[in-house]
Amino acid sequence: MSEVKKIATRASYGAALIELGKKYDNVVVLDADLAAATQTGMFKKEFPERHIDCGIAECNMVGFAAGLAATGKVPFASTFAMFAAGRAFEQVRNSVAYPKLNVKIGATHGGISVGEDGATHQCCEDFALMRAVPGMVVACPSDDIEAKAMVEAAYQHVGPVYMRFGRLAVPVINDRPDYKFELGKGIVLREGKDLTIIANGLCVAASLEAAEKLAADGIDAKVINIHTIKPLDEELVVAAAKETGKVVTVEEHSVIGGLGGAVCECLAEKAPVPVKRIGINDVFGESGPAAALLEKYGLDAEGIYKQVKEFV
């Protein structure tokens, strides 16, 4: 049996930026002294004249990006999720979103899988913060293929986009001929009749594995990849809820305000069904190996399986 290919989506982000740079002269990449970690150093090497290191000054970087967008450039401002959504929130809101500027934010190292860097760098609140900003698209890819497609789609979208990428290498799950990416459109990865599992990011692969464990117990789970949290694919979410009668959301984010919040808001108005939110339960993360943290917070396949089985 061949080993499953694993790639960190931050590496996919860096590779995708190079392809964008080759195709579009107006792409500019900005960094805040983290080009190696965000994997945008590859773009810097290929297009040094279109890479700007703003230093450890994330607020200035976002303001700089807004200025570039106002002159017709398409800037990709890159830093850790904690700094992109947290430290620079005011600039994202007032300098980018309020004037509706065409700035793309590449936020790497999101969630607890950042690992040993600990709670100060494990941003589990970024979806909630960015979802609340008017006009902001919020997305998180499940693998290498989806991450690259997302970067291209973000370029094509006119307006601000927040994309979260991960540090941890994750399985490639979208390597199939019929794969199609579109912002705001979810993807059904597994059909099922007993309940629906809705996930994004690295939790998609774990949810698929959990679904197989559930199947062995006679529980048939539908699995949907909702890579775009805003705008949410409400049509797909509502249809799945009506079809299966129960919904579980899984995300490497607080259960407050992220994918789980978006799904609950939608279903409360359009298709009320029982919902279980799996994620970070109103606590901070801690330092440790990524795999150990995912297990501790119930976000590995076994943890998801146990929580879903208890819910059903």
Predicted segments, located by residue:
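Thiamine diphosphate
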Residues: 1-164, 169, ...
